[in-house]
């Protein structure tokens, strides 16, 4: 997250860190949507990944953090068909149901789409500097606004006329998602409205 601040430790009980199983390296984020499923981006598909729930600082292992092995990943269609603006969505089923605790709880799924101009938050352990990659130990949060899709379409000429992607950000720039935050949630009014796919 560029231009954000450290998230409050109580602010993200649904935020999941995805690690590569072998190198135990953090590479993506996800959102716990119930005791058995984590919602993330299709680009975060890895052969063997471990989902870590209830983690705040990557440096200090809290007793509350629980590592869960993934049982199966379900992508929207043949995983090869996702693009930066379509079907970049995946569900990871946990091998065993996660016990809800203060540090790990599910995010409410959105009942209705967020209106343009609504304020939402993005969060994750992605890089916090643009010139070089600087991964923080604790997740960063940033407030951004929802926009009409046409606003993003004007900014990124490659976007198709119709898309299932949401458009969000800050028009004056300076606040954005960045490398390593993919798969993390877009939260509006405490509900998950989207999944971070890419920032520009």
UniProtKB/Swiss-Prot annotation:
Pfam families: Trypsin. Residues 1-200 form the Peptidase S1 domain. It is found in: Secreted. GO terms for cellular component: extracellular region; secretory granule. This is Snake venom serine protease VaSP1. Optimum pH is 9.0. It comes from the Eukaryota. GO terms for molecular function: serine-type endopeptidase activity; toxin activity. SUPFAM superfamilies: Trypsin-like serine proteases (SSF50494). Its main location: secreted. It comes from Vipera ammodytes ammodytes. The record marks 182 as: Forms a covalent bond with the inhibitor PMSF.
């Amino acid at each position: 997250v560029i231009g954000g601040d450290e998230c409050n430790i109580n602010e993200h009980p649904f935020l999941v860190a995805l690690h590569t199983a072998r190198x135990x390296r953090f590479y993506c984020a996800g959102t716990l949507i119930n005791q058995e499923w984590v919602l993330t981006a299709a680009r975060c598909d890895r052969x063997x990944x471990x989902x870590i729930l209830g983690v705040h600082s990557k440096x200090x292992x809290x007793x509350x953090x629980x590592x869960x092995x993934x049982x199966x990943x379900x992508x929207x269609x043949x995983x090869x068909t996702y693009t930066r603006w379509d079907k970049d969505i995946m569900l990871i089923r946990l091998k065993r149901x996660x016990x809800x605790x203060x540090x790990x709880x599910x995010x409410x799924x959105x009942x209705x789409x967020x209106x343009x101009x609504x304020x939402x938050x993005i969060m994750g352990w992605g890089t916090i500097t643009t010139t070089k990659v600087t991964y923080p130990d604790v997740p960063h949060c940033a407030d951004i606004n929802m926009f009409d899709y046409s606003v993003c379409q004007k900014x990124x000429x490659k976007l198709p006329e119709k898309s299932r992607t949401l458009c969000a950000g800050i028009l004056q720039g300076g606040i954005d998602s960045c490398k390593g935050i993919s798969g993390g949630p877009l939260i509006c009014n405490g509900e998950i409205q989207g999944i971070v796919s890419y920032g520009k």
